[in-house]
């Protein structure tokens, strides 16, 4: 019995070490960071029309009414903490719509933000050079890739889930998963 208990404990510790989850960064903590580093907020788009029975706001490749409402609500929370930022999006209807509903600002569309391999990091650095705070709307597989590649985190983002990164001395640092309501 003692052997099996020890084996179970070792197995549990091994699995918890292997399956790392992202650190949590509270949105409320962002304004407290009075440094000169650029911040990058990377969000997944809102609820997709083509994978939902909810009412669409436009074509099937866009977001639903629920997705638009979530983007507006999250944008209001975000704007209360971080009001000065530039908005970027991949070139899909759903990311562009989410970015517009979230921010109410003009959205810069960069197709290269859809390329979710090692080149994404140079793209992120280039975008961050231009702004103190950058908000990017992309896709779940891009966010999962970034989390896995940078920190070996297992992260399957839901709609409008996001990561926070800092660009410090030319390097990208993945701070964690952004907790909007905290």
Model segments located where?
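Short, surface-exposed amphipathic charged segments that create phosphate/polyanion-binding patches used
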Residues: 121-127
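Active-site-proximal alpha-helix that buttresses catalytic centers in soluble enzyme cores
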Residues: 5, 10-112, 116-119, 143-144, ...
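Generic beta-sheet signal
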Residues: 38-40, 130-138
């Amino acid at each position: 019995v003692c052997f099996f208990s020890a084996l179970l404990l070792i197995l549990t510790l091994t699995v918890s070490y292997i399956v790392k989850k992202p650190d949590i960064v509270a949105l409320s903590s962002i304004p407290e960071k009075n440094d000169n580093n650029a911040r990058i907020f990377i969000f997944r788009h809102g609820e997709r029309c083509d994978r939902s029975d909810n009412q669409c706001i436009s074509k099937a490749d866009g977001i639903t009414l629920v997705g638009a409402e979530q983007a507006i609500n999250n944008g209001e929370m975000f704007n209360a903490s971080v009001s000065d930022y530039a908005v970027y999006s991949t070139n899909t209807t759903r990311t562009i719509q989410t970015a517009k509903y979230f921010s109410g600002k003009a959205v810069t569309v960069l197709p290269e933000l859809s390329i979710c391999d090692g080149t994404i990091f140079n793209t992120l650095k280039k975008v961050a050079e231009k702004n103190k705070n950058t908000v990017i709307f992309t896709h779940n597989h891009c966010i999962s890739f970034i989390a896995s590649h940078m920190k070996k985190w297992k992260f399957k983002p839901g709609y409008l889930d996001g990561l926070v990164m800092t660009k410090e001395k030319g390097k990208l640092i993945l701070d964690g998963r952004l907790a909007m309501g905290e």
